[in-house]
């Protein structure tokens, strides 16, 4: 198999924020270098890998993208498609679908792969659930994904706001199926509180991304814990056995094939039903570099392995993202 890879990356490990880091102001976005410079993991210069031929995005014609953006701005809503610089934004917006990001545009974490802004968030917008519900109804969406930034500043991690959004969507658009893509609710007692709250009005699909293999967590997801994320998925499934669970993993951050397979086995052992596997693409020069472009043949092999493990649906390909064609994935898991 042909592969494009860099063998290693030098890391400079520092403790806490940079000494020159200015105090964070509520609602002010730290992006790119400003964000990553606050991370406990700093990346030395690494060679930039040339994107292979299979990393291509089709940009549709027409006004659908601008029309959807206008509708979102009109209702003061945010999509992770825009905030995280998703490469599939034109395709999804062109088909009138979007993944809504609630609880603001500022994340309390500083993950090295993510283009969402870091900082000190503002309090949740009490009007957001109603605005979201009305927008979903106005757009006639049959399937929506609702995600959020990490909110380590909130006692429940934002779980009540998720439930308020689910409730508002179901009130305004009863036929819409709802998938939530949640943060990890990490913190003393926070997972238990979050799961208790989510039980008030569970989604149709519960998604939480594992993101990468455990050996890379310190570099890729500082502030997160691999086993904690697995436990969140398993505990939700134990409480709601009829609700499909889902997770996702990115490739190209330094993992090897056996580590990926082991992570897939861990997810199945924690009762995850659906999995997405896609290529990591570096958002800016300040973020974690791409260390390898996995081939389409690799993704097919992982898809086959996922089905061997018993996943009800496996979406595996270079441009696959967690909420990309989420409605199709959900149908594969029996959500109708």
Curated annotation (Swiss-Prot):
It is an enzyme of class 2 (transferase). Pathway: Protein modification; protein lipoylation via endogenous pathway; protein N(6)-(lipoyl)lysine from octanoyl-[acyl-carrier-protein]: step 2/2. Gene3D superfamilies: Aldolase class I (3.20.20.70). It catalyses: [[Fe-S] cluster scaffold protein carrying a second [4Fe-4S](2+) cluster] + N(6)-octanoyl-L-lysyl-[protein] + 2 oxidized [2Fe-2S]-[ferredoxin] + 2 S-adenosyl-L-methionine + 4 H(+) = [[Fe-S] cluster scaffold protein] + N(6)-[(R)-dihydrolipoyl]-L-lysyl-[protein] + 4 Fe(3+) + 2 hydrogen sulfide + 2 5'-deoxyadenosine + 2 L-methionine + 2 reduced [2Fe-2S]-[ferredoxin]. Residues 93-312 form the Radical SAM core domain. It holds the Pfam family Radical_SAM. The keyword ATP-binding does not apply. Its EC number is 2.8.1.8. Keywords: 4Fe-4S, Cytoplasm, Iron, Iron-sulfur, Metal-binding, S-adenosyl-L-methionine, Transferase. [4Fe-4S] cluster 2 binds at residues 107, 111, 114. SUPFAM superfamilies: Radical SAM enzymes. It comes from the Bacteria. GO terms for cellular component: cytoplasm. [4Fe-4S] cluster 1 binds at residues 81, 86, 92, 323. One of its GO terms (molecular function) is lipoate synthase activity. Belongs to the radical SAM superfamily. Lipoyl synthase family. This is Lipoyl synthase. It comes from Stenotrophomonas maltophilia (strain K279a). The gene is lipA.
């Amino acid at each position: 198999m042909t592969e494009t890879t860099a063998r290693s990356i030098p890391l400079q490990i520092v403790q806490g924020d940079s000494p020159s880091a200015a105090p964070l102001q509520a609602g002010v976005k730290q992006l790119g270098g400003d964000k990553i410079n606050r991370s406990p993991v700093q990346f030395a210069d690494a060679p930039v890998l040339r994107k292979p031929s299979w990393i291509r995005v089709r940009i549709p014609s027409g006004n659908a993208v601008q029309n959807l953006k206008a509708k979102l701005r009109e209702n003061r809503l945010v999509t992770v498609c825009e905030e995280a610089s998703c490469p599939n934004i034109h395709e999804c917006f062109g088909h009138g679908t979007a993944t809504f990001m609630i609880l603001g545009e500022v994340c309390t974490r500083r993950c090295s792969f993510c283009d969402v802004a870091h900082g000190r968030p503002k309090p949740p917008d009490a009007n957001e659930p109603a605005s979201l519900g009305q927008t979903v109804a106005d757009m006639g969406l049959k399937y929506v994904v609702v995600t959020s930034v990490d909110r380590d500043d909130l006692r429940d991690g934002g779980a009540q706001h998720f439930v308020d959004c689910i409730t508002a969507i179901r009130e305004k658009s009863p036929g819409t199926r709802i998938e939530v893509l949640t943060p990890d609710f990490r913190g003393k007692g926070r997972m238990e509180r979050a799961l208790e709250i989510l039980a008030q009005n569970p989604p149709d699909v519960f998604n939480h991304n594992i993101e990468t293999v455990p050996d890379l967590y310190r570099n890729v997801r500082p502030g997160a814990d691999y086993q904690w994320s697995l436990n969140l998925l398993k505990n939700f499934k134990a409480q709601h056995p009829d609700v499909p669970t889902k997770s996702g993993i990115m490739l190209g951050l330094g993992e090897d094939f056996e580590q990926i397979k082991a992570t897939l086995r861990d997810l199945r052992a924690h009762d995850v039903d659906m999995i997405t596997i896609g290529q990591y693409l570096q958002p800016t020069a300040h973020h974690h570099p791409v260390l390898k472009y996995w081939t389409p043949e690799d993704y097919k092999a992982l898809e086959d392995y996922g089905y061997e493990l018993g996943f009800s649906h496996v979406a595996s390909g270079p441009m696959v993202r967690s909420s990309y064609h989420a409605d199709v994935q959900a149908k594969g898991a029996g959500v109708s």
